[in-house]
Amino acid sequence: MGGLIILTATVITSLFYIKSYPRIIPILFVTVGFGIIGFLDDYLNIGMKRSVGLNPIQKLIGQFIITGIFTYYLMTSGDVGTGMLIPFTGGFENGYYLNLGWLFVPAVFFIVLGTDNGVNFTDGLDGLCTSVTILVATFFTVVAIGEDSGISPITGAVVGSLLGFLLFNVYPAQVFMGDVGSLALGGALGIIAVLLRQEFLLVIMGGVFVVETLSVIRQVGSFKLRGQRIFRMAPIHHHYEL
């Protein structure tokens, strides 16, 4: 449950900038919402000493509700359009966009939930999730400042809190972020990517998250269909530990 440190530091820092940067409000909403889901899972698992916390369906329902509220905000506020910026074609104002129309709604769900669970899968090896998330959040901070997007305070807060956390999370780890940290961070990265129009580059910058997720999908799919495991253990970072 060490992720409470990251979440608390990020939220408190961001609150100082809400008046001047109102765009960080929806990011805080999703980050805290996903963090609460993770906290409940960790509390049931550790605090109540249960073998498992929330089951996958319960987590997914919570994630769907929070993402749905955020998506409704996007579509009604006009904060962003229904297009995705094609990488390396320009910035917000002069870049080329892939207009998805109504498909933008399921795309947002896919991006946010995919990122959230990808970060969650990556957590489990000392310093791995923290270091990769620092790289992605730093990239987003540079973009946020360069595009004057109005969300740089929260991206910077994420980087700062993670740098402090990493000191105690590298091998041998003294503190672990748990689901409260990984789900909060995953939700934040997904939402930030949408608001910055960097959905495509998220796949590149967060390549480790993609690989971890695909390893779980392949492992589960292979076992269900053929009764055989591809990896000794999934997500894939556990395969290389054994």
PLM regions and their residue ranges:
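Membrane-interfacial loop-to-helix junctions in multi-pass inner-membrane proteins
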Residues: 20-26, 47-62
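Membrane interface segments of multi-pass transport proteins and intramembrane proteases
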Residues: 45-55, 86-98
